[in-house]
Amino acid sequence: MAAGGVDVSRSSVAVKKDYDFYRNGSRDVYVRQSGRDDERRQIKRPSDHDLRRNDGRHRSRLAYEKGELREEAEVQRPSEKRRKFSPIVWNAEKVGRAPSREKTKSPFPVPTTTVISNQAVAGKTTSNDQVNALMSPEPSYLAPVQPSEALLAVKHPVDDLEEGQLEEEQVMQEDVKEGLLEEEQVMQEPNIKTSRWGTGLTSPKEELISVNVSKTNRWNRSSLTPECEEVMVSEEQQCYSSGSGSGHLSVEKLSADGNSGREYYSSDHDELEHEDQDSLTPGEMNMMFGSRSVNEFQKLNKINEGTYGIVYKARDEKTKEIVALKKIKMKEDRFEEEYGFPLTSLREINILLSCNHPAIVNVKEVVVGGKNDNDVYMVMEHLEHDLRGVMDRRKEPFSTSEVKCLMMQLLDGLKYLHTNWIIHRDLKPSNLLMNNCGELKICDFGMARQYGSPIKPYTQMVITQWYRPPELLLGAKEYSTAVDMWSVGCIMAELLSQKPLFPGKSELDQLQKIFAVLGTPNEAIWPGFSSFPNAKAKFPTQPYNMLRKKFPAISFVGGQILSERGFDLLNSLLTLDPEKRLTVEDALNHGWFHEVPLPKSKDFMPTYPPKR
């Protein structure tokens, strides 16, 4: 006691009684907590016979299955201390089988009863047994003893049952059978044949790739891991813009100026179809379950019809919004017989539904045809123009500030794709859509795919020939984002000059036109050049870069001019060696976009009357 303090007793005057049921289910033992210690008292309880009759149907199945009921070779205990078990199931995860119901006579002189579970017989104690040992101390002679096999083999005759106990045993047998049946129904092994997905309607995995997935699931991340599975993208579908682009691999009509590229051979398409075809399984093809019907849209007019699809301008009857309906044509080949849906179209749908960026076309959903229509439609936002059509309608090239505005939007959208490990593999003016608000959006992900690290071999039959980089023309199969940057350089040159930079008529002619402007490469300029399959061809020797002559800094006869910084950007994008080619991040941070004239605001970009 502190000096000068008052000695105050710590004992409680009023005794607080708290009676709690034990968690082991005993109903006859209570705890009374008072000032300093806990007293355990035995509360008077009704006769065993009454409890057996009243509580026979309320015994816990789990307690029985765990062996915590009276069973063979059990140590007897006075009847007045026999415990009843709570019907509350404390641990439903542990499921066991009911032991045998035969009884044996105890070899011990003391007629006591102690709970012996299956785990106790095996030499283990359950958590409830430990709680019982701590909460209710018993004499040492009441400790559970493991019976021998000889004792377990002894059977107790039915005549030895007490009065009323036979009825109790019958009730218990019925309860246990019902309990085991219910437990078997609940705890049965998972079987896909008996699940609700065994019917082929839908599955959890298919629900995740449902075409009605919310836009909140779209990628809004800065990067993805390179080891993630290939994003399923498509080659078959063209952008819904008019087929005015030209060149090899184009799925659109030839341009009005008569420039033509090589036809898109079916063998090239087959090679693209077979590229990583094992990445899709038949279970991932059932993605149209629960989609809306195309009858909920009113078709206004046809925008374009190509080899692989028809595009309509339509109105959503529910929201009254003008959209573009892109009809996916089904082809009869092995993939559709196996999966029921074109592989490349499935890839395109999945990647477009996963992307969320203002410079990438927005695919709202995928709808199915009517009762007699098995076609599938992509519902996309409607934009009035494509860059190829706008360039054909203009009588003069874009100004430098307008080119900067368009290039920044293109690079911004491409940065989003490359950050998410996606290569577009078909960038060209006809795959860039525009609206009357000055916005540019990338579309047509038919050849796009997700790449990883290390780089895997891909098909080189991608990208329209006029915008295809030299490494693909030379037969390279290991490539990454540098192929898109070459296409961006070709688009920039076309925006400045109003005409394609390398309009080759064949792959060989395309290479010759590239080398005629940029110079013929060698091992010093391009390490590894001679190792390409098509590098053995003899090309005219031209050691000089003639690109500056096409885009002079000063012009005395009119036409477009390009500053030093602008030429540096264009020349860096059109570097022959893909390892030295400019990346999208470096292109966005280039000084050309920060010098006068500055990029024009999208609000002040020229508008054009809609043609569709």
From Swiss-Prot:
Major subcellular location class: nucleus
Phosphoserine sites (modified residues): 453
Location of this chain's protein in the cell: Nucleus speckle
Keywords in alphabetical order: ATP-binding, Kinase, Meiosis, mRNA processing, mRNA splicing, Nucleotide-binding, Nucleus, Phosphoprotein, Serine/threonine-protein kinase, Spliceosome, Transferase
Xref: Pfam families: Pkinase
Record's catalysed reaction(s): L-seryl-[protein] + ATP = O-phospho-L-seryl-[protein] + ADP + H(+); L-threonyl-[protein] + ATP = O-phospho-L-threonyl-[protein] + ADP + H(+)
Deleted gene: phenotype: Aberrant callose deposition, defective pollen wall formation during microspore development, and severely reduced male fertility.
SUPFAM superfamilies tied to this protein: Protein kinase-like (PK-like)
InterPro entries found in the cross-reference section: CDK, CDK11/PITSLRE_STKc, Kinase-like_dom_sf, Prot_kinase_dom, Ser/Thr_kinase_AS
Modified residues (Phosphotyrosine): 308
Region (Disordered), start-end ranges: 26-60, 239-278
Top EC class, one word: transferase
Residues that, per the record, bind ATP: 303-311, 326
Active-site residue list: 426
GO cellular component terms listed in the entry, alphabetical order: nuclear speck; nucleus; spliceosomal complex
EC number: 2.7.11.22
Family per record: Belongs to the protein kinase superfamily. Ser/Thr protein kinase family.
Protein name (database record): Cyclin-dependent kinase G1
Organism: Arabidopsis thaliana
